[in-house]
């Protein structure tokens, strides 16, 4: 994030044009001074780091999934799909997830995205790209609020 560099892959030329326009409009189209060298180093020498990161994220996912299975079984966790963002099905709570997310923030001090932001009504989205200790603490807070 500090390097202000990212890859966006869009096969459709029209979608690419729309993305390019948004990048320019939001002043996100220029790389900073270190970005090019950092990207070259990451692609050429980052394989081992990436493998370890993916392993750690998978272990975080397993930790979260097992936690929900044991402590919050009414809230199924969706299978992970090439990301560090986990979707939790909250439809059994029969409450809007905007309300659940607000309660988690106010009572548990856990900031979670509600699915409505992403056309996922009834789901919460949890970011697992964090130290396991942080994840464990956040999950325990979630359990105390909604469990």
What label would you give each PLM region?
Residues 1-147:
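PLP-dependent class I/II
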